[in-house]
């Protein structure tokens, strides 16, 4: 049971963060950097992203109380939001919430350290990823549950680091067509996850649906 939940967490976060699709963005941002510099940036971005997502996992319930957020409403809203990202992925488009605006891209190129922004936020730990983590933590308080989500986060972040570290190699082996196929597959998986979140939220808001 716990293993299947960890797999669910991993698939959900992997699909919404889409580390494979972010490889071209990483290569663009680190153009002109040495392999060692790229590795250092990828490592720092991964560590920061892990702590950001872990913070939302641990303190998510406090955010619920502070803003009087209904758990079921969050699942519906988060599901709709994530479905929007899935729709863009299915059409091989970049999600606006995870892609860079012109000013952000220009600013990131002028800075020596891009690991905090835009890599950690919004590329790795973007709104969709944060919403997914908060939804997964909603309504649960057991240590085992939090540990399972934390393991899922760590696994996705570790894979993201590896994809960034070997980004040049991956880009040379996978053409644009292959990248689009993978992106659409991630979109399909994410759409299924989003529909499940919306369904769970609606059942919680309207118990009559379960009768």
Curated annotation (Swiss-Prot):
Pfam families: MarC
Keyword Transmembrane set for record: yes
Keywords, comma-separated and alphabetical: Cell membrane, Membrane, Transmembrane, Transmembrane helix
Membrane topology: Multi-pass membrane protein
Protein localization: Cell membrane
Gene Ontology terms: cellular component: plasma membrane
Membrane-spanning residues: 1-21, 47-67, 69-89, 114-134, 150-170, 188-208
NCBIfam families the UniProt entry points to: NAAT family transporter (TIGR00427)
Family, as annotated: Belongs to the UPF0056 (MarC) family.
UniProt name for this protein: UPF0056 membrane protein YvbG
Organism: Bacillus subtilis (strain 168)
Chain's gene name: yvbG
């Amino acid at each position: 049971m716990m293993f299947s939940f960890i797999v669910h967490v991993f698939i959900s976060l992997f699909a919404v963060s889409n580390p494979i699709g972010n490889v071209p963005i990483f290569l663009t941002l680190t153009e002109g950097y040495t392999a060692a510099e790229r590795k250092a940036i990828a490592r720092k971005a991964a560590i920061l992203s892990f702590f950001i997502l872990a913070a939302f996992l641990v303190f998510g319930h406090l955010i619920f109380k502070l803003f009087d957020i209904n758990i079921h409403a969050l699942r519906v809203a988060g599901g709709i939001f994530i479905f929007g990202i899935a729709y863009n992925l299915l059409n091989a488009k970049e999600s606006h919430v995870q892609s860079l605006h012109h000013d952000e891209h220009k600013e990131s190129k002028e800075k020596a350290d891009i690991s905090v922004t835009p890599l950690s936020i919004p590329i790795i730990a973007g709104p969709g990823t944060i919403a997914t983590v908060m939804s997964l933590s909603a309504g649960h308080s057991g240590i085992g549950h939090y540990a399972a989500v934390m393991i899922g986060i760590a696994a996705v972040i570790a894979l993201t680091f590896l994809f960034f570290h070997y980004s040049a190699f991956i880009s040379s082996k996978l053409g644009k067509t292959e990248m689009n196929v993978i992106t659409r597959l991630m979109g399909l998986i994410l759409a299924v996850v989003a529909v499940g979140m919306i369904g769970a939220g609606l059942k919680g808001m309207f118990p009559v649906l379960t009768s």
